[in-house]
Amino acid sequence: MLASIPHMETLRSLPRNPDVVARHPSAEDLDAAQQLISSAQAGREHPQDRHYTDNGSRKSEAGAPHSHHEGEYPIVQTSETPMNGHHVEKTSPKSQKDTSFLGHSCSNCGTKSTPLWRRSPTGAMICNACGLYLKARNVARPTKRNRTQASPEAYHPQNQSVGSQPDPAVTGSEGCTGSCPGGGNCNGTGGAEGCDGCPAYNNRVYKSTARGNVAAHALNRAGNSDAVPSPEAEAPARNSGQPEGNMLVACQNCGTTVTPLWRRDENGHPICNACGLYYKLHGSYRPTTMKKTIIKRRKRVVPALRENSPTAATHSSHGSSASPEASSPATLAYSHDERHRYYSSEPVDQYHRISPAAQRPFGFAPPPVDFTNFNSGAVTLPHHPPPPRLLEPGHPPLSQFARRSISPSSSGNSKKRTLAEAGANTDTGPVPTTLEAGSNQLPPIVSSANPPPPARLSSISSILNHAHARDESRLDPSLAALGRQQQSQPHHPQSSPLAPTQAASQSLPGVSNMDNHVEDRRAKLQREAEEMREQLRAKERELAELAGQ
């Protein structure tokens, strides 16, 4: 590999364009070459670091030749794995290209590969994991978290510390038979239908099949350096690495191996989620008497599944009441139609004869203009006389728009009226059909025969305009005359359809009435101007008195 470095530098230094003069190697190229050389030297000095994933017997066989043949590392491999040794030597520089400077080792955990080298407050070189741990917790990262550390001296104290713990590891290994009852009561062993995505399912148990072989090899090397282990410890190690893998993770406080989330205490020891939350809230360790064998999970309801179910509006999968969002559009439309029929006081048989296609456009139409205070506070200019067709006294509202124009829902009033009040506003006798069928004019919206509801819909206008002091001088004389005629003439329900038209034609204002209206309007404006002048003089006198003081 060293022989290939000058060749690579020669190829890199060749110019791509023949017109360009050949350049010298830059500082970056020299730095890259120096890193490759240092990585090759580090591989020869520490060959045992590359065989921790192999069997312990292979390591013992290859240990002696490495000390004598230091420069012939690819050749001194045993006959069993010549290709494996060549592969390790070939891929070792590539696996260490993530480091910023090769040849370093973490002063805390001893690792030689990390995505980012950091500096401790004392100036020592530490890896990225130890640096982040130190920055977050202000304490050194525990070395037992480093999984790449494989020396027998490092595994010996771990086995002693784990072995000193009582029965939690045994219960964890015995509980891996898949006896979870499910239904929200979880013991972390799996076996139920919903255990696949359960957070309380111990991830050490869940992923033990992928890590079993590595854990078994590591513990076998630890067993070779110690005295003769007990048969109880050798049998699980030969079968699978699951019990040993589970023994490495247990709560330091209560000893449980089942938790939705593993936490760390202030000393870096693993604790379960319950003990961690208890310590965070109360500031003291959780009593062991509070330990439970079953973790109760919260029942989470998915809204999408509940809406798609056929019985979403009336039933729930967990026995809870249905939410307001689950009501169907048909129910909302039905309630809207019932409210509209309640306000319009239509007969039941007439309401059911109307087709749904005819009802739907009116339900989504914009609200009409409020003509509630038309008769009481309207002031008509002299050059804009009111249209005679819309002021005929004998015509009640003919269509659904007229009923909606005086309803509280269209006028913005949220107070409901009783059926008696609604019936009093719309009880005007039979509706003539000749004008609606043959006329191209709009139906009358408000007339003198259908006054607004007393003391409710015009309450704001009565407060502002002072109904007790109102006189007919503010109204149009033609409107006042029509109102007096309507009050003097009794209403005949059995009159013919042509009778209202004849009465309206006899009571239409003439040219003389318009002249009288202009004169009255001029006199009224003169009186108002005189009153304003008098008020202005009074204000000027007050200002003069204040200035004199």
Curated annotation (Swiss-Prot):
One GO CC term of this entry? nucleus
What does the UniProt entry report for the null mutant?
Leads to increased iron uptake. leads to partial derepression of triacetylfusarinine C (TAFC) and fusigen production as well as to cellular accumulation of ferricrocin (FC). Also leads to increased oxidative stress.
Instruction: Read off the InterPro entries from this record.
Output: Transcription_factor_GATA (IPR039355), Znf_GATA (IPR000679), Znf_NHR/GATA (IPR013088)
Top-rank taxon:
Eukaryota
Q: Which Pfam families match?
A: GATA
Q: Give the UniProt keywords, A-Z.
A: Coiled coil, Metal-binding, Nucleus, Repeat, Transcription, Transcription regulation, Zinc, Zinc-finger
Q: What induces it?
A: Expression is induced in mycelia grown in high iron medium or transferred from low iron medium into high iron medium, and repressed in mycelia grown in low iron medium or transferred from high iron medium into low iron medium.
PROSITE patterns noted in UniProt: GATA_ZN_FINGER_1 (PS00344), GATA_ZN_FINGER_2 (PS50114)
The biased composition feature labelled Low complexity covers: 309-331, 485-497
Q: Where is the composition biased (Pro residues)?
A: 383-396
Q: What is its main location?
A: nucleus
A GO molecular function held by the record: sequence-specific DNA binding
Annotated coiled-coil positions are: 511-549
Question: Which stretches of sequence are listed as region Cystein-rich region (CRR)?
Answer: 180-198
- Compartment(s) of residence: Nucleus
Q: Point to the regions of Polar residues compositional bias.
A: 498-515
Region Disordered: start-end pairs: 40-100, 141-174, 223-244, 306-332, 375-459, 482-535
Entry annotated with the keyword Acetylation? no
What exactly does this protein do?
Answer: GATA-type transcription repressor that regulates iron- acquisition genes through specific binding GATA sequence elements of target promoters. Iron acquisition regulation is critical for survival under both iron-limiting conditions (to acquire essential iron) and iron-replete conditions (to limit iron toxicity). SreA targets include genes encoding a number of key iron-regulated factors such as those involved in siderophore biosynthesis.
Record's comment describing the protein's domains? The conserved cystein-rich region (CRR) localized between the zinc fingers is also involved in DNA-binding and transcription repressor activity.
Q: What is this protein called?
A: GATA-type transcription factor sreA
